[in-house]
Amino acid sequence: MGPQGPVGPQGEGVNWKIVDLNNVGSQSSPWDYSNYSDNNYYFAKFDVPALTNFVFTDGNVNGYILLTENGQTIQHSLPYVLHKYDKDASGNPIYYTETVDFVYGVGWVQIEVRDSDFAYEADEKIVPATMSFRIVMTY
């Protein structure tokens, strides 16, 4: 290997923007219900002006759910998949998976919560817990 070459010109650098979406599902930011006959889910849509056409086209957008474990806040990248257990009215076990994910477009982000049990009528009565999220845009 030869000697190191001269220092090059300074690069353009990286920009980033972090948007925290706190207490999604609370009274001030409630979940909406999709009410589709074949694929119901809960969602919350937010205006995110920093998510410009440039960020959408040439940048990167990552979503995280903020969780508390052992008294500390941690970030888990989306989608976040959680296997759950419940009982029906007769006491029989019900196993299902809850998936929390996000979709986005220019100027907005939508958080979605979907259960795999396909019990659409029941899902409308079982509202997801309040959750907090972080959206990180790099461009």
Model-predicted segments: where are they?
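Extracellular "spike/adhesin" assembly and maturation modules
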Residues: 125-129
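Collagen/collagen-like triple-helix recognition
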Residues: 1-17
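Compositionally biased, intrinsically disordered low-complexity segments
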Residues: 10, 21-22, 103
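Short, structured beta-strand segments at or near domain termini in extracellular proteins/domains
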Residues: 130-139
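Extracellular attachment/recognition segments
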Residues: 27-122
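N-terminal segment immediately downstream of the Sec signal-peptide cleavage site
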Residues: 17-29
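Conserved beta-strand and immediately adjacent loop positions that scaffold enzyme active sites
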Residues: 3, 62, 134
